[in-house]
Every structure is written in structure tokens, then in C-alpha cells.
């Protein structure tokens, strides 16, 4: 965190992205509190944003993701020259993961319009999708196997129950 603190000390502006309260910055929260002289802005899509520490905010709950809001800023305020394949990929990953690969939190065509523009910017959508949704760590596979082993099938209801205790989740 020392490197982060050095960057923050030299910042002209701190941008908080994708959370509704500064306390959600975790370990950095205390460090960030020491920089009350640096203006802060919030860009977010969650409900009940705590705006008390920000000089400005863009908080739209009927937007798929904060990444979509960032894309709108980039595309609508003259920053498209900075939208290279790396930045476009990061924005697309944010939209994909916040929407469960476009299965929820879509409030209209805008999300798809933005993603279309991102993909046309040399973004390798199949590769990104594969890395996010088809690549599993050993721990994730072991957890899946453990869960499937604990599954109780209720044939008469065409349903199944998988449950984990808090202790099991922390293993």
C-alpha cells in the first residue's frame, strides 16, 4: 500500500468507482481519510450511495454497471482517442461480470450499443468470455466438487439443494 499512498499523495483528483460507500475501500479506507484536501468523485451504479465525501458524483442505479458509466463518459465527452484495446477490454469485462454475461441488470439497448462499440475496437470477446467463464482455479473446482457431493436432490419437486455453512465457506 505504500506505493498506492505515494500515488494518492500526488493526485489532483481521486475517482472512486463501483461502490456506494468509501468504507468499502477496505484496507485503503484509513489511508484515504488522510487526504481530505484532494477532491474526490464517485462513479457508481449501486443504491444508497454515501455522497458526503465527494465533490461530484455520477450515480445511476438503472445502469448495468459502473463500467457502462465509464464508457459513456469516455464516448460522450471527447475521450475516445484514449479508448485503446486494453481500456476497451477492461470496460467490457466490467460490464460482462456485473451483468452475469448479460443475464441481468440490463435496462435497455444502451448496454449492448456500448459493448458493440467496444468489441469493434479490437476487443477479443470470445477470448475474454472464455477466460472469465470457462477458466477455473484448482480451489474453485474443488469447491464445486464439494458442493455437488453435498447436493440433495428432491425428485418430486424437480429441485436440488446445495448449502454450505459459514465454516465451510472459510475453509
Where do the model's predicted regions map?
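N-terminal small/polar loop signature for handling phosphorylated ligands or for N-terminal nucleophile
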Residues: 1-34
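Short glycine-rich anion-binding loops that position phosphate/pyrophosphate groups of nucleotides
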Residues: 19-22, 46-48, 166-168
Amino acid at each position: 500500500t505504500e506505493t498506492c499512498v505515494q500515488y494518492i499523495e500526488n493526485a489532483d483528483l481521486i475517482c472512486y468507482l463501483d461502490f456506494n460507500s468509501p468504507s468499502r475501500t477496505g484496507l485503503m479506507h484509513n489511508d484515504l481519510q488522510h487526504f481530505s484536501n484532494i477532491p474526490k468523485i464517485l462513479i457508481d451504479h449501486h443504491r444508497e450511495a454515501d455522497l458526503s465525501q465527494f465533490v461530484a458524483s455520477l450515480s445511476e442505479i438503472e445502469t448495468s454497471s459502473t463500467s457502462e458509466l465509464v464508457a459513456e463518459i469516455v464516448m460522450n465527452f471527447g475521450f475516445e482517442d484514449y479508448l485503446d484495446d486494453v481500456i476497451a477490454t477492461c470496460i467490457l469485462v466490467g460490464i460482462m461480470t456485473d451483468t452475469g454475461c448479460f443475464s441481468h441488470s440490463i435496462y435497455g439497448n444502451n448496454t449492448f450499443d456500448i459493448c458493440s462499440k467496444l468489441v469493434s475496437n479490437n476487443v477479443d470477446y470470445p477470448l475474454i468470455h472464455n477466460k472469465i467463464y470457462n477458466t477455473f482455479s484448482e480451489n474453485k473446482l474443488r469447491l464445486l466438487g464439494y458442493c455437488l457431493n453435498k447436493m440433495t436432490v428432491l425428485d418430486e419437486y424437480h429441485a436440488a439443494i446445495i448449502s454450505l455453512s459459514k465454516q465451510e465457506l472459510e475453509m
